[in-house]
Amino acid sequence: MVFEYDVLVIGGGHAGCEAASAAAKTGAKTCLITMDMNKIAQMSCNPAVGGIAKGQIVREIDALGGEMGHITDATAIQFRMLNRSKGPAMWSPRAQCDREKYILEWRTTLDQIPLLDILQDQAEELLVKDSKVLGIKTLWGIEIHAKATVVTAGTFLNGLMHIGHKMVEGGRIAEPAVHHFSESIARHGIRVARMKTGTPVRIDKRSVHFEEMEEQLGENDYHQFSYFGKQHTLPQLPCWTCATNAKVHEILRQGLADSPLYNGQINSIGPRYCPSIETKLVTFPDRDSHPLFLEPEGTDTNEMYLNGFSSSMPWDIQLEALHHIPALRDAKIYRPGYAIEYDFFDPTQLKHSLESKLIEGLFFAGQVNGTTGYEEAAGQGLVAGINAANFCANSEPFVMKRDESYIGVLIDDLTTKGVDEPYRMFTSRAEYRILLRQDDADARLTEKGYHLGLASRARYDWWLQKKEHIERIINFCEQTTVRPEEINNLLETVGTSPLRGTTRLSELVARPQLNFQNLSEKLPSLKEAIALSPNRTQEIAEAAEARMKYKGYIERERIFADKMRRLEDIRIAGHFHYAEMHDLSTECRQKLERIQPETLAEASRIPGVSPSDINVLLVLMGR
């Protein structure tokens, strides 16, 4: 039996769901194949979305017309804006979600997309002819043919789980691994390697002594992920904090010989910024304690996630260590922590569209590209889905630049630098952080999403209305003057220099000690101007305030970004045989030959390519 589609998406995780949704919504007849339709968009690790830089990615997905933002809002059981101690440019939203409701919301969303079919089966073999993808053969013997195929298989490709000395093949606990599929891809010259990740123990909340823990409440203000969706409506639940201690560390150290990470059982590299508890002990031997966060998995379950206690040690050692934490002295666990090794593919063999450089019509997204995190996966999935649909329609690839989005930074890092450990996004990876704020993803991307056919007309109209009100507030502040007697009492209270004469309101807004909230208390006209916005009043005010506070920084970053854009316009793909260019350094020749960057800007970001190497290429290009 053979099924025919425009786009085939393999894997129903966070990357696959966004890819399938994007492809179908932009006009491609799409099939999403997954091993278990009841575990679509499963949160395999922490039931949370967002965080530092990750929250910005989710807002970018939403601004383009993707699904993750509004689904997170609909299933959030605790919301917080991180980094509030820093300026608004560094703020990052994060939400704790109800795991089961998140899956149901995703399934409901996908079921309502007209051009999307979901099939429960397993990819067994990639079908390729003349370096062009044809589709796949499945475990049950059918063939699915497609003009474009997107691989979003997560940790399932030759997945191997570890708890102590026990090793079990699987892509997730109690779910089978996928064999043979990696090999069917690798035989076409695509490089495959191994990575490792892990997850903590899950605890029965009825066995926890919460009186021994510190409660951590969420925030109930106007912030959310979606620029267009409804606000979160589920009951908001607290998280709880505690810490390990010297006795816990002693028990864990005694068990290091049984840890797969230290007995030679696991050789793959795990995520640097989400280490296991045993790795923390080895890396920071002088630390007496490490913080732990007990987080609810939903409103209708007793299951709780112990953030900070990822481990692959034997079950009995994990449990004994937990019992020496006062709040967890009687803890009962649903399942222990475990590690998992899995296959990934070298992302430097991808174009910025996430299409393979070796097989036409084949796209990769998510953990199979060497990333870690739901948000990173979803962002890649969205781009891969858009480009798979564009490929079918013979349209230009959709590529986001580093000054346009964190998703653009992510994909550029993957395709030009590659990975030697699971890649996680941080604000520090972006050189244009002021341009990539969480408050302005709609300003950067909603128009693009609308023209792609992904963002709805209603969403686009709302953005145009919001933009009008942001500019109205900014114009009001630039045209309104403030006298010293109106404001100096406030300036003295907040510790900033008083006015000596009449000053424009926009100049006061730019001061770090001042904001719309405290200024509105002294200036009724500002309060009235803000209130004129018809809805999402506070969100609009926040965006206007951020643009005024960072005006100078925004202008400087834009000038620098425009200079770099000139290098982006100089295409070098196919122009050179790098191995023969002896004016370049040896390392440069090797890297350029292996990665084959498409533009001079991409070449400049490859580790080992120096400014002098770029100058040589510029001269050879006649620039």
Residue ranges and their predicted role:
Residues 2-15:
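Beta1/beta-strand and adjacent pyrophosphate-binding region of the FAD-binding site
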Residues 3-5, 139-148:
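Core beta-strand elements of the Rossmann-like FAD/NAD(P) dinucleotide-binding domain
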Residues 10, 143-154:
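Short hydrophobic core segments
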Residues 21-125, 140, 152-172, 176, ...:
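Conserved N-terminal/central alpha/beta ligand/cofactor-binding core
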Residues 36-38, 54, 81, 183-319, ...:
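An anion/pyrophosphate-binding glycine-rich loop and adjacent beta-alpha core
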Residues 127-143:
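Conserved beta-strand-loop-beta-strand element in the redox core of flavoprotein oxidoreductases
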Residues 305-371, 399-412, 537-591, 596:
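A glycine-rich dinucleotide-binding beta-alpha-beta segment and adjacent secondary-structure elements
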Residues 429, 435, 446-615, 619-623:
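Extended, charge-enriched "interface" segments that sit outside catalytic cores
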